[in-house]
Structures are given as structure tokens and as C-alpha cells.
């Protein structure tokens, strides 16, 4: 949900009773502490705005570990949000980690039917991560956006349960 043409999802327009009853898990990587702290803060703020008092927060080492954690949690939650940041270095490692996280999280969502909010930043520079982390002066708040998308999808899918 970024860039030109991104939808506007206002959590206050969701049925407050439905949204507040959702069980939400947030799985967050640990690399790049400043950026991750911003992403997690934005995610927790979005959960609170939706009326979710206590989302489950699980920390994992890195973005590569996000899919396995999301897979373990998904059957027990209405929505899962994965937060991480991968910054390009001088080797193909960036490409492998980004591909593994993206395809792994997509697989979890499709296989379980549980929405997985994608809050993994794939950046060329640390500054790009800071600009998207919801920190003071940031241009975007991807942690907040990932929770908003996951919860909106979960509420929509509840009608088909």
C-alpha cells in the first residue's frame, strides 16, 4: 500500500465491534533497531486505533525468519502482520532474503486463509527505511499501513467464515 494511487483505509470506518474482537499477531525482525522501533510503534498504534487492546508481539532475528513465525501463529489469529527491513549490500544476499520473505509470507496467507500484512521494507539505503518507518520526519508509516491492511482484510473475510 504505497506510492501513487494507494487506497485510503480509515480504521474508524470499520465496524468497531468487529475490529476490536480480532486477534492480531505482529511478528517483527530485529535488524536495524531504529527503523524497526518505528515500524513496531506504528503497528501498535494502528492496533490501538482499531480497538485491539493487546496484540501479540513476537520478535525474531531477521526478515528471513518472518515466514516461519507467521506460519506458526496464523492458525491462532485473525490477522498477522510481518515487519522487517532489508537494506541492500554488496552481495546478492539482499535479493535472496527479500524473495524468501515475500514468497514465504504470501504462501502463509494463501495457505492458511489468514491475512498477512506485509510490512517488510526492502531498501537500497538506510535513509529509505527511515523515511518509511513512521519516525519523526518520516514520509510514510509502513507499520501502521500493514496493520491497517491486514485488519481491513480480516474484517472483510469474516463475512465468509
From Swiss-Prot:
Positions bound to 5-amino-6-(D-ribitylamino)uracil: 31, 63-65, 85-87, 118
EC number annotated for this UniProt entry: 2.5.1.78
One GO cellular component term: riboflavin synthase complex
Catalytic activity of the protein: (2S)-2-hydroxy-3-oxobutyl phosphate + 5-amino-6-(D-ribitylamino)uracil = 6,7-dimethyl-8-(1-D-ribityl)lumazine + phosphate + 2 H2O + H(+)
Binding site for (2S)-2-hydroxy-3-oxobutyl phosphate: 90-91, 132
Keyword match Transferase: yes
HAMAP family in the cross-refs: Lumazine_synth (MF_00178)
Name the UniProt record assigns to this protein: 6,7-dimethyl-8-ribityllumazine synthase
Source organism of the structure: Paenarthrobacter aurescens (strain TC1)
